[in-house]
Amino acid sequence: MPYTFNFPKSQSSFKYSIKSLTNSRSFPMISIYVTPQSTPKFINNQSIDKMTVLSSFRSRNSFIIARSILSKLLRKNKADFKKVSKSVSLLWGSVDNSFKNYFEYLSILESQWHDKKSSNLNPISSTRTTSELNYIELCSSIYNQSRKHPRSVQGNKAKFRLYKNVSKKSNRKPRRLKNGFKVSRSTINCSYGIYTEDVFQ
């Protein structure tokens, strides 16, 4: 009875090693060295958006992995690159789904490895909480530096307070005009504090 390859059962926990994804009935794993395409990130004046950009390197698909593995076997007969690619393409079109599923499984493993590696190389900086903010960073105005200020904003001290200006405005009395004009005592107060007077003859 021919052996058919099946994907392992999916579980909720994420597998971090190849050994945990294989069992005694799995195909033998062939380790392939992948040249890292990422450059080391040094401390500089770049923005956070540029530092957290993922690498442009993509993991290989199932056919590329099959071609890289089978080309090592075909090149032992001193075949050139064109013959190797043509032979692998003919083989890929004539094999069953179990053969393709195996290399699809390898491509999933490689994509998981690449995602984990890229996330470790480019950690996203966590947002600063209010407990990490200094008192000096919160003040936009000048204050007395000789006075000891708290290092954090926790507690009920050194907090800014805003007071509403509730001072009374002096009400201007309407002027009394002579020479036959009478000014009404009623005034209209607009929001800008400008008084308008109704003059009746």
From Swiss-Prot:
Keyword Transport set for record: no
DNA-binding feature ranges: 56-122
Domain of life: Eukaryota
Protein's cellular compartments: Nucleus
GO annotation terms (biological process): mating type determination; regulation of mating-type specific transcription, DNA-templated
GO CC aspect terms: nucleus
Keywords for this protein: Activator, DNA-binding, Nucleus, Transcription, Transcription regulation
GO molecular function, one term: DNA binding
Family per record: Belongs to the MATA2 family.
Function: Mating type proteins are sequence specific DNA-binding proteins that act as master switches in yeast differentiation by controlling gene expression in a cell type-specific fashion. Transcriptional activator that induces the transcription of a-specific mating genes.
Note: The C.albicans mating-type-like (MTL) locus contains, in addition to the genes for the regulatory proteins (MTLA1, MTLA2, MTLALPHA1 and MTLALPHA2), a and alpha idiomorphs of a phosphatidylinositol kinase (PIKA and PIKALPHA), a poly(A) polymerase (PAPA and PAPALPHA) and an oxysterol binding protein-like protein (OBPA and OBPALPHA). Most C.albicans strains are heterozygous at the MTL locus and do not readily undergo white-opaque switching and mating, but mating occurs in hemi- or homozygous strains. Mating takes place in opaque cells, produces tetraploid progeny and seems to occur rarely, if at all, in nature. Conservation of mating capacity is rather thought to be due to the simultaneously regulated white-opaque switch, which seems to play an important role in host commensalism.
Name of the protein this chain belongs to: Mating-type-like protein A2
